[in-house]
Amino acid sequence: MAAAPAQGVPTQLSHVALRVRDVGRAVDFYTNVVGLQLRNRRENAAFLGASEEQSHELALFGLGDTAEGPDPKGVGMYHMAWQMASFADLEQFHERLLTHGAKIAGYSDTSCNVMFFDPDGNELEAFWEAPKELREEARRPGGNPLPRLAR
């Protein structure tokens, strides 16, 4: 018999809020490169989403052009990840990153993903979770074909 769901605990992550230098530039990146939909825009904030189920998954708040960027040696968020529905979607997404000149951070050697940066230096990931029966193949060293496609 399955255990009863825990009570008084979160059920899922709702959204991530990022501080950016220029909200307009960030909206352009997250809509045209990442593919999110702009849901609401205010003077110095924007709310975007991928799923129609939620009002937004990403909130952007502008700090101005002189704001410092993320510090990879400091405490804070390392990256956020966007899950793709299929490997073909991940391939198309990867191609869009390359076409738009997005800075690629790298690829996992043991999963199907691409790590990249937004214009403010926030690190992001797009990945495809292989079906259970294919995960061992995807997780073996060299199992991620995207680095080969980027050449």
Give the location of each predicted region.
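Vicinal oxygen chelate
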Residues: 1-7, 12-21, 68-151
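Conserved N-terminal glycine/acidic-rich loop preference
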Residues: 3-10, 17, 49-51, 57-59
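Amphipathic alpha-helical segments
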Residues: 22-37, 96
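Alpha-helical elements of the RecA-like P-loop NTPase motor core of helicases
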Residues: 27-28, 91, 125
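Short secondary-structure junctions
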Residues: 35-41, 101-105
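Conserved short beta-strand elements that form part of the metal-binding/catalytic scaffold
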Residues: 37-74, 117, 123-130
